[in-house]
Amino acid sequence: MTQALLLMNLGTPSEPTAKGLRDFYRYFFSDPYVFDFNPVGRWLLRNLIILPFRAPRIAKDYAEIWMENGSPLKVYADEMEASLQKSFDHQGTKVLVRTGMAYSKPYVWDAMAELEAAGATEILLLPMFPQYSTATTAS
């Protein structure tokens, strides 16, 4: 039996630009658990307010915190994955560690497929978001 640990997080834009934010927000705000109301209202809010107005404005904030290697969330998630894998390997514990995001690459389902392809028969999911909400636990 090969065990695996999947570090799960919400996700992040691929780049600190209006386009990067729009792509991320389009997927994120399409989830009915994020906006738990009428699908038509969700579509209107996403496509007529959030994508055209909020994404360009927030892109500036993302650009200020963006790191040389990418989004802080992705950079630190990658570092945590590598550190945990190194620790398990050093202890001689056969545990595969991967990171998966709900709304951006690397996606949770891709990480799970990779773990299964590597022979994982037991996968422990570890949510890295600190709060309970249907957008993080039910999606």
Regions found by a protein language model. Give the residues of each.
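Active-site-proximal alpha-helix that buttresses catalytic centers in soluble enzyme cores
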Residues: 1-139
